[in-house]
Amino acid sequence: MTVKLTIDCMGGDHGPSVTVPAAVKFVRAHPDAHLMLVGIESAIRAQLKKLKALDDPALTIVPATEVVAMDDPVEVALRKKKDSSMRVALNHVKEGAAQACISAGNTGALMAVSRYVLKTLPGIERPAIAFALPNPTGYTMMLDLGANVDCEPQHLLQFAEMGHALVAALEGKERPTIGLLNIGEEVIKGNETIKRAGELLRASTLNFRGNVEGNDIYKGTVDVIVCDGFVGNVALKTSEGLAQMLSDIIREEFGRSLMSKLMALLALPVLMRFKKRVDHRQYNGAALLGLKSLVIKSHGSADAYAFEWAIKRGYDAVKNGVLERLTRAMADNSVSLGDGEHDAGGAGHTGPAAGQHAEPPAAQSSKA
């Protein structure tokens, strides 16, 4: 089966200078992939020419005349820039020409345009960004990581249901464990939104294990961690900054003297393995959960190596039939979670979900 993906080549901080080289490298390593490069044709052609890939049959240029800037308000992307690379890429997925879209564009705009073009799955109020964070035994699914900075308690409940369905679909776990990210394990901790969300989760049939703290994120304490997009994005980027700092410190210390350089030479295999494990670029690419089609969000600041990983997330999700499996899991969950409404200050809600992923990935923010 040929995996067809659309690439929003103009998205992100670096545009075609990153997205096109990543696409070229990806198709050369994956002969069953076909990528549609969407954006300003002249800019894409210039990059392809530089890479001697103008005639590559696995790459197709799809012209778009507008670009959604990283600081464009959502309404501009949605109402004014109807021929943007982002919108055209999503339209091709909607029309069935491609199976997934990969974009490093403005997160708020991508979420809004994706919801408008692709629509949400039944029962989903707000799609969320989900990211698989590595832990000692595998990965922990965390959501939301930037799509919804302000959430009501029932939204956090729905994120938990979506995470439940995603892990159930990917891992075959009947009862994935759920944790609510908070400033303490005690039920009295947190703001009113978190406290109410905890009440809703405890009243649900989900396998809710209570509050988890920031130091639980990488321990594998639970299968799914739920939070609003503001907290989730800060936690994610703090982790990435820490990983980068550790790599820089190790490099600096081993370069201090001739003796330390000799020690580094002896320890090189270990250092290379360490560098690979903490390199956040290989976890780039997060799913927008709750849409009727697959959309993968890359970091806006991604380099070509990181963006290639985001493409791989979409490719793997299609190959593994993740959307179909999630849709089935959601249908099962709607039965297992019950049809009763969860009262949240007058807002009714019933449970389903949706998403992506096959191996540890990453996620985003409003500019991410």
UniProtKB/Swiss-Prot annotation:
Q: Where in the cell is it found?
A: Cytoplasm
Principal subcellular localization: cytoplasm
Q: What function is annotated for this protein?
A: Catalyzes the reversible formation of acyl-phosphate (acyl-PO(4)) from acyl-[acyl-carrier-protein] (acyl-ACP). This enzyme utilizes acyl-ACP as fatty acyl donor, but not acyl-CoA.
Source domain of life is Bacteria
Enzyme Commission no = 2.3.1.274
Name of the molecule in the record: Phosphate acyltransferase
Q: Cite the source lineage.
A: Bacteria, Pseudomonadati, Pseudomonadota, Betaproteobacteria, Burkholderiales
Q: Pathway it belongs to?
A: Lipid metabolism; phospholipid metabolism
Q: Which organism is it from?
A: Burkholderia vietnamiensis (strain G4 / LMG 22486) (Burkholderia cepacia (strain R1808))
Tell me, what's a Pfam family for it?
A: FA_synthesis
Give the GO molecular function terms: phosphate:acyl-[acyl carrier protein] acyltransferase activity
Top enzyme class: transferase
Which keywords does this Swiss-Prot/TrEMBL entry list? Cytoplasm, Lipid biosynthesis, Lipid metabolism, Phospholipid biosynthesis, Phospholipid metabolism, Transferase
Q: Which residues form a coiled coil?
A: none
Listed under subunit, the entry gives: Homodimer. Probably interacts with PlsY.
Q: Which GO terms describe its biological process?
A: fatty acid biosynthetic process; phospholipid biosynthetic process
Q: Which family does it belong to?
A: Belongs to the PlsX family.
Q: Where is this region: Disordered?
A: 335-368
Cellular component GO terms, alphabetical: cytoplasm
Q: Which PANTHER family match?
A: FATTY ACID/PHOSPHOLIPID SYNTHESIS PROTEIN PLSX (PTHR30100), PHOSPHATE ACYLTRANSFERASE (PTHR30100:SF1)
Q: Which reaction does it catalyse?
A: a fatty acyl-[ACP] + phosphate = an acyl phosphate + holo-[ACP]
